[in-house]
A protein has these predicted regions:
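Hydrophobic pocket/interface hotspot
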Residues: 16, 20
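Alpha-helix N-cap/helix-start and coil->helix boundary motif
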Residues: 10-13, 132-133
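C-terminal "cap" of GNAT-fold acetyltransferases
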Residues: 87, 122-136, 141-169
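Short, charge-rich amphipathic segments
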Residues: 101-103, 125
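Acetyl-CoA-dependent GNAT
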Residues: 3, 7-11, 21-99, 106-111, ...
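A short, ordered amphipathic alpha-helix with a cationic face
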Residues: 14-15, 139
Length: 169
């Protein structure tokens, strides 16, 4: 059972959104209250991705991972949110919860870095939730390091600190 990576199409986006919400609940429930993760629903997250894709598809790329023809993960890359043309932003890697530890996240990360390289980027950045220790370890094993920058994101009603990580591509 091998993983296949391909560029997402508009037909993938509702399923990507449902996967995204399942991944968020599984990954964040150890440090965020259930009410913060109750919304959006899987369906609403699907429509969020359909809408987001319409205004970001020209400068972002979503890659989906499939195992035996079934969607099991995705990555989303785009330009740096601070405006540095030499830097790419890894917006997201999300997996079906049962897919963790099977190499899919690493395959998506490697593909995202290759995409940035192909687009002329020399540096990559991402934001990771400070409380998400497994994700932080995953990125650190992949060569990412904290930059010292912090910000807060509102997830549901919970203010959630994020840390910026960077690495060369």
């Amino acid at each position: 059972m091998t993983i296949t990576l391909r560029h997402a199409t508009v037909d993938d986006l509702r399923a990507v959104g449902a996967l995204h919400q399942r991944s968020r609940v599984a990954a964040y429930s150890s440090f965020l209250p259930a009410e913060a993760l109750a919304d959006p629903t899987e369906e609403a997250m699907g429509w969020y991705w359909v809408e987001r894709w319409t205004w970001e598809r020209d400068d972002h790329l979503m890659t989906v991972a499939e195992r035996d023809g079934r969607l099991v993960g995705f990555s989303y890359v785009g330009p740096d949110d601070a405006g540095d043309p030499a830097t790419g932003l890894l917006n997201a890697i999300h997996l079906e919860p049962a897919e963790r530890g099977r190499g899919t996240g690493r395959a998506l990360m490697d593909d995202a870095l290759a995409t940035m390289r192909d687009r002329g980027r020399t540096r990559a950045v991402l934001w990771v939730l400070a409380g998400n220790a497994p994700a932080r370890r995953f990125y650190e094993r992949g060569g990412w390091r904290p930059t010292g920058e912090r910000r807060e994101e509102l997830i549901g009603t919970a203010r959630t600190p994020q840390l910026r990580y960077a690495r060369e591509v």
